[in-house]
Amino acid sequence: MLPVDAVVLDIEGTTTAIDFATSVLYPYARERLPNFVREHRGEPEVAAIMDEAREVGGVWNDEAVVVRMCHWMERDQKVTPLKTLQGLIWEEGYRSGDLVSHVYPDVAPALRAWHGRGIRLYIYSSGSVLAQRLIYGHTVAGDLTPLLSGYFDTRVGHKREVGSYRRIAEAIGVSPRRILFLSDVREELDAAREAGWQTIWVVRDRLPGLAAAHRRVTRFDQVPV
């Protein structure tokens, strides 16, 4: 591998159990979404989310928007206004102590070591930037946000699109060939590699195909940076 100046991390299946969102975060948001909208509808941030959701979903009243959002959640669709609203709901949960994020035991030591060597660390996830900050700010290993230089979500583009990785490289001001991307999803790694990034396939909760085209690790202490 070439030297790296930045490491970009996926969340689910990479730093965090792949089912953390589906078994903990999504049910928490789904149960609370209707009441959250009713209680906070007058707040500018929630009003803007509802306006965006109406445009995306093609519906025009709050009740229909809530139904559409629940439908998006059931289908695990990466719709930006839904992700933003989920983040607000999770924020309440983390602040109240209802939620604590899972990270694998090898993650925090590796992040601290890389950060200590001057490597910049970023998160790229389909979850909103707010949700990402909450996940890493309230982990079983403590607050990891001081180690992170920035966050990217679907507003920069979807994770299987080459252009997303080019935009991230431009945004952080690092040459693509000196950026390392860690993910458990081959299609994301393929897109990052096509953008000129270095890639490592993190194999934790599911096995890659036999024709894996990327270097593989099972733990972060195996990452050669």
PLM region descriptions:
Residues 18-71:
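Conserved phosphoryl-transfer catalytic core
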Residues 57-105:
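Metal-dependent phosphoesterase signature
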Residues 2-23:
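Asp-based phosphoryl-transfer active-site loop
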Residues 15-19, 130-133, 190, 208-209:
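Short catalytic/ligand-binding loop motif for oxyanion handling, primarily in non-cytosolic enzymes
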Residues 121-167, 171:
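Extended hydrophobic/aromatic segments used for targeting, binding, or gating
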Residues 87, 96-139:
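Substrate-recognition element of Asp-dependent hydrolases with the DxDx(T/V) motif
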Residues 1-4, 149-225:
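Asp-based, Mg2+/Mn2+-dependent phosphohydrolase catalytic module
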